[in-house]
């Protein structure tokens, strides 16, 4: 795959807006990658890796806020760690997860990402998802397509559910929706070729956009889990909704996606269950 030039604007392919998002994601990504190396030492010594991860998360969010606010001073900012910060421009908001896949990061598993979405009047118009561990950079802008390191993305074309590999989320034991997730998996396990549970919603969505996964569903997510990923899937030719099939994941917190066929089949199966 091609490489997005580090921190340098790409005149041919990407807008000024995307370049702002990429530059911010890469800078925060370098910080997280350094912290990942430290985590591996802390795992051996058992000296409070969880506290360290919390600090790494907050540090990455502040870096993102600083860079994005400098480039677009009036925009609002909705972040997992710092909550909502109102901007003077009420029509635009960044929706940011500075470290999606915290548990993976805590255990030194290189499946985590920075997720940046930009909403205009409540509709996501651009997204960047960056995994600094493997330098995979996903970008999408409304009407302009989705890309992974400069390569155009398309969702997978399979039209038989029993040939599909799908991902799902599994809430922690004790959460009210844990039992429902297990029930959904039990119903679907005989209908698909396989399940994957990677532990980072933004990357699950990006993997659907890239055709690596045929579908993905999860309930009770937050806007920062979904914002960048949903435009990624749509710009790659996929369909995204809530469990009802025609609802907005940003409003409901539930997401189902895949190509048009897979999305429809998943909705048909999941909707009656919960």
Roles of regions detected by a PLM:
Residues 44-45, 69, 84-87, 129, ...:
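Short secondary-structure boundary/capping segments
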Residues 154-274:
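An extended, acidic
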Residues 21, 25-28, 127, 146, ...:
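Small-residue (primarily alanine) positions within well-ordered alpha-helices
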Residues 88-147:
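DPxDG-like acidic metal-binding loop motif
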Residues 7-99, 261, 268-271:
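N-terminal subdomain of lithium-sensitive/metallo-dependent phosphomonoesterases centered on the IMPase/IPPase/PAP
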Residues 58, 62, 81, 98-101, ...:
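Generic detector of well-ordered alpha-helical packing
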Residues 32, 57, 68, 102, ...:
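Residue-level signal for inorganic ion chemistry
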């Amino acid at each position: 795959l091609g490489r997005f030039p580090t921190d340098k604007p790409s005149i041919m392919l990407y807008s000024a807006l995307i370049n702002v998002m990429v530059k911010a994601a890469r800078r925060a990504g370098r910080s997280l990658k350094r912290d990942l190396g430290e985590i591996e030492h802390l795992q051996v010594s058992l000296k409070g890796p969880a506290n360290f991860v919390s600090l790494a998360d907050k540090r990455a969010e502040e870096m993102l806020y600083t860079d994005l606010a400098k480039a677009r001073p009036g925009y609002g900012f909705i972040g997992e760690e710092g909550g909502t910060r109102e901007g003077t421009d009420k029509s635009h908001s960044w929706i940011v997860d500075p470290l999606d896949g915290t548990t993976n990061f805590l255990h030194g598993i290189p499946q985590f990402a920075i997720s940046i979405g930009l909403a205009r009047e409540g509709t996501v118009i651009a997204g960047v998802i960056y995994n600094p561990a493997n330098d995979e950079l996903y970008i999408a802008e409304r009407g302009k397509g989705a890309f992974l390191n400069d390569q155009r993305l398309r969702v997978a074309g399979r039209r038989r559910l029993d040939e599909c590999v799908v991902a799902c989320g599994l809430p922690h034991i004790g959460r009210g929706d844990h039992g429902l997730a297990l029930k959904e998996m039990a119903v679907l396990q005989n209908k698909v070729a396989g399940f994957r549970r990677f532990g980072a919603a933004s990357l699950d969505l990006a993997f659907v956009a890239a055709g690596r996964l045929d579908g993905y569903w999860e309930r009770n997510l937050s806007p920062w889990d979904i914002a960048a990923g949903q435009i990624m899937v749509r710009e790659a030719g996929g369909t995204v909704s809530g469990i009802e099939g025609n609802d907005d994941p940003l409003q409901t917190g539930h997401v189902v996606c895949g190509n048009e066929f897979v999305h429809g089949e998943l909705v048909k199966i999941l909707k009656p269950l919960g």
